[in-house]
């Protein structure tokens, strides 16, 4: 009995040290050495100060900015502590009302825009924290942003194209734009 108890205790302590201390320290150390920016949260800086992460969406509401995907985190948009989807099905009246309200807000912000509204501008993601939108979503907003900033639409479209990321491995996902990085670049431009 003592032998079994002792062996169990040694195994428990060994595995606790290995999986609870040694492995996390090893992975953290490797991350800091091999991927220092990512291990620090993929932060974006302005004037030497961190202003956000390229991995978490930020709320933008002014006409001069490209707007990201709607956030399902309530009551505060893009709240990482409340990450999660709305879990509303496609026929749920609450979801339909939310989408209709988002469409109305986009139309009101840019009444002359006759382009079809990309779906990612009116639907929240599963996490509610998406930092990126489709190229179509960014291009849809180019005219509004250009007018608000006193830039030409061609300039805004060129910046969108500069920030475009392709599909992963050439075939996974859709081409996309990081909203925070693009808005930081727009802030650096003067009309």
Swiss-Prot record:
Main localization, broad class: membrane
Q: Where in the cell is it found?
A: Cell inner membrane
Membrane spanning stretches: 7-27
Example GO molecular function term? P-type potassium transmembrane transporter activity
Domain of life per record: Bacteria
**One GO CC annotation:** plasma membrane
List the Pfam families hit by this protein, alphabetically: KdpC (PF02669)
Which InterPro entries does the UniProt entry name for this protein? KdpC (IPR003820)
How this chain sits in the membrane, per its record, is:
Single-pass membrane protein
Record keywords: ATP-binding, Cell inner membrane, Cell membrane, Ion transport, Membrane, Nucleotide-binding, Potassium, Potassium transport, Transmembrane, Transmembrane helix, Transport
Question: Which family, according to UniProt?
Answer: Belongs to the KdpC family.
The record describes the protein's role as: Part of the high-affinity ATP-driven potassium transport (or Kdp) system, which catalyzes the hydrolysis of ATP coupled with the electrogenic transport of potassium into the cytoplasm. This subunit acts as a catalytic chaperone that increases the ATP-binding affinity of the ATP-hydrolyzing subunit KdpB by the formation of a transient KdpB/KdpC/ATP ternary complex.
Q: Report quaternary structure and partners.
A: The system is composed of three essential subunits: KdpA, KdpB and KdpC.
Q: Output this protein's name.
A: Potassium-transporting ATPase KdpC subunit
């Amino acid at each position: 009995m003592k032998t079994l108890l002792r062996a169990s205790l040694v195994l428990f302590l060994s595995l606790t040290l290995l999986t609870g201390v040694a492995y996390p320290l090893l992975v953290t150390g490797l991350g800091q050495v091999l991927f220092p920016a990512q291990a620090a949260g993929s932060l974006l800086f302005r004037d030497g100060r961190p202003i956000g992460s390229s991995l978490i969406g930020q709320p933008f509401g002014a006409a001069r900015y490209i707007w990201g995907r709607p956030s399902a985190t309530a009551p505060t948009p893009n709240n990482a502590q409340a990450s999660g989807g709305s879990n509303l099905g496609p026929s749920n009246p609450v979801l339909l009302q939310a989408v209709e309200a988002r469409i109305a807000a986009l139309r009101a912000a840019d009444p002359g825009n006759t382009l079809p509204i990309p779906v990612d501008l009116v639907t929240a993601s599963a996490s509610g924290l998406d930092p990126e939108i489709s190229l179509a979503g960014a291009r849809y907003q180019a005219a509004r942003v250009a007018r608000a900033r006193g830039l030409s639409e061609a300039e805004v479209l060129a910046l969108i194209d500069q920030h475009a990321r392709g599909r992963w491995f050439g075939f996974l996902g859709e081409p996309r734009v990081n909203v925070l990085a693009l808005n930081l670049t727009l802030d650096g431009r003067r009309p």
